[in-house]
Regions:
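TRNA-recognition modules of translation machinery and tRNA-sensing kinases, especially anticodon-binding
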Residues: 2-378
Length: 378
C-alpha cells in the first residue's frame, strides 16, 4: 500500500545519489548506545528497551540507526575500502520506551542515510538535499529546513561555560531534567520539551555567536552549497538535537501542516566527526540524517496527498470444474513466471461471485476457462 509506495520512492532517491543499502541487527550490546548516543541523551537515560541474554550479556533493542551502522562500518573495516567516502542508507524498526502519542510510537520504522569518510561541507549540503528531495518526491509542500552549527570541540567547550553561567541563576525555575543537564550537558537544556518557550530560553546566548573562526567559516561553506543546490533553509541557533555525538552542522526538517501538533519534526540529522573514534574505530568523519516513516505518513494525510498506488492485477483466471481448475493452476503459474501479476479462485465460488472478486481486485483482464474448449485444445 502507501507505505511500500513511500519506501520505493525513498530508495529511488538514495540510489540516485549513489548510496548503498545496509542492514544492521535489531539489537546490539547496550554499551554501543551508552557510548555512542551518549549517557545524557533522553534515548539512553529513559527510552531504551534493555535486556540480559542467556550469556549474561546486556543487550538493547536499537533506539536509532547511526550507532549500529558505525559499528558495522568499523567491524567490516569499510574505512579500508578504496572507494571513499562510504555512502549508506538503511530502513528498519527502532524501539523506544516512551509514552505513546500522536507521531511517537514505541516501535517505529525509521529510514536514514550515513556518509563516512569525508569532512567536506558539500557532503553536509548533500545529506540535507536528500532529506528535502525525499519529502518533495512524496508530494509534501509545507516543509521548513532549520540548520545550525554546534562548531568544533573548542567552540562547544567555550559555549558550554557561557551557558552554565547564564542558566545557573535560574536553576530553581527549571524542570528536573534541565537541572540534571546543567552540569552534564547544558546544550541539551535548549532542547527542553517543558520550558522550551520560556523567556529564559529565548534570551539564552546563541551558539552561533561563540563559534571560532574555523567553525564559522565551515558553516558559511555549508550554507553556500545549500544555496548552490537551491535549497531554502533558516539558520536557527536553538537547534541542538537530542543526541550527544553531533558537532558542526545539525539540521531539522519540520512539517508546516495545520493540526500536526508538537511532533512536527519529520526528520533530523547532523555531522558526527568524533563518533567512529569514540566507538574504537579510526578517526573518520561522518554525517547523516534519519526520519520516521510514521510521522511522514501523518504529514501526507494532513496535507491530503493522494499517493498513486497501483492496487490492480493484470489478470484473473476463472473456472468451475476440476479439469478447468487443473488447467488454471498451470496457466496462473506460467503467467506469473512471465512477469504478470495474476490471481485465481481459491474458495470454490461460482462464476457470478468470481466476476465480483475480479472486480474487487481491479483486474485488467479476465480469462474464463471452459471444459469444451480445453477438450478441443482451443
Amino acid at each position: 500500500g502507501s507505505e511500500m509506495c513511500i519506501r520505493d520512492r525513498i530508495d529511488a532517491v538514495c540510489e540516485r545519489y549513489n548510496y548503498e543499502f545496509i542492514r544492521t541487527p535489531i539489537f546490539e550490546a547496550s554499551e554501543l548506545y551508552h557510548r555512542g548516543v551518549g549517557e545524557t541523551s533522553d534515548i539512553v537515560t529513559k527510552e531504551t528497551y534493555d535486556f540480559t541474554d542467556r550469556g549474561e550479556r546486556k543487550m538493547t533493542l536499537r533506539p536509532e540507526g547511526t550507532a549500529g551502522v558505525v559499528r558495522s562500518y568499523i567491524e567490516n573495516k569499510m574505512y579500508g575500502d578504496a572507494k571513499q567516502p562510504i555512502k549508506l542508507y538503511y530502513n528498519g524498526t527502532m524501539y523506544r520506551y516512551e509514552r505513546p502519542q500522536s507521531g511517537r510510537d514505541r516501535e517505529l520504522t525509521q529510514f536514514g542515510v550515513e556518509v563516512l569518510g569525508s569532512d567536506d561541507p558539500m557532503i553536509d549540503a548533500e545529506v540535507i538535499s536528500i532529506a528535502v528531495n525525499i519529502y518533495k518526491m512524496v508530494g509534501l509542500k509545507g516543509i521548513k529546513v532549520n540548520i545550525n552549527s554546534l562548531g568544533d570541540k573548542e567552540s562547544r567547550d567555550n559555549y558550554r561555560k557561557i551557558l552554565i553561567e547564564y542558566f545557573t541563576p535560574y536553576i530553581n525555575e527549571m524542570c528536573d531534567d534541565c537541572k540534571n543537564r546543567l552540569e552534564k550537558n547544558p546544550l541539551r537544556i535548549l532542547d527542553c520539551k517543558v520550558d522550551g518557550d520560556s523567556d529564559i530560553m529565548k534570551k539564552a546566548p546563541k551558539i552561533t555567536d561563540y563559534l571560532n573562526d574555523a567553525s564559522r567559516e565551515r558553516f558559511e561553506r555549508v550554507q553556500k552549497y545549500l544555496d548552490l543546490l537551491d535549497i531554502d533553509y533558516v539558520v536557527n541557533p536553538s537547534i541542538v538535537r537530542g543526541l550527544d555525538y553531533y558537532d558542526h552542522t545539525v539540521f531539522e526538517v519540520e512539517a508546516m501542516v495545520e493540526g500536526f501538533g508538537s511532533q512536527n519534526v519529520l526528520g533530523a540529522g547532523g555531522r558526527y566527526n568524533g563518533l567512529v573514534k569514540e566507538l574504537d574505530g579510526p578517526s573518520v568523519p561522518g554525517m547523516g540524517f534519519a526520519m520516521g516513516l510514521g510521522r511522514l505518513m501523518l504529514a501526507i494525510e494532513k496535507e491530503n496527498i493522494e499517493l498513486p498506488i497501483d492496487d490492480s492485477i493484470d489478470c484473473f483466471v476463472m473456472y468451475v470444474s476440476d479439469t478447468e481448475k487443473d488447467y488454471a493452476t498451470t496457466l496462473v503459474q506460467e503467467l506469473r513466471m512471465n512477469g504478470y501479476k495474476v490471481d485465481t479462485e481459491y474458495t470454490g465460488r461460482g462464476l457470478k461471485a468470481q466476476f465480483k472478486q475480479a472486480d474487487r481486485l481491479n483486474s485488467k483482464f479476465l480469462i474464463i476457462l471452459n471444459d469444451e474448449d480445453l477438450k478441443n485444445n482451443e
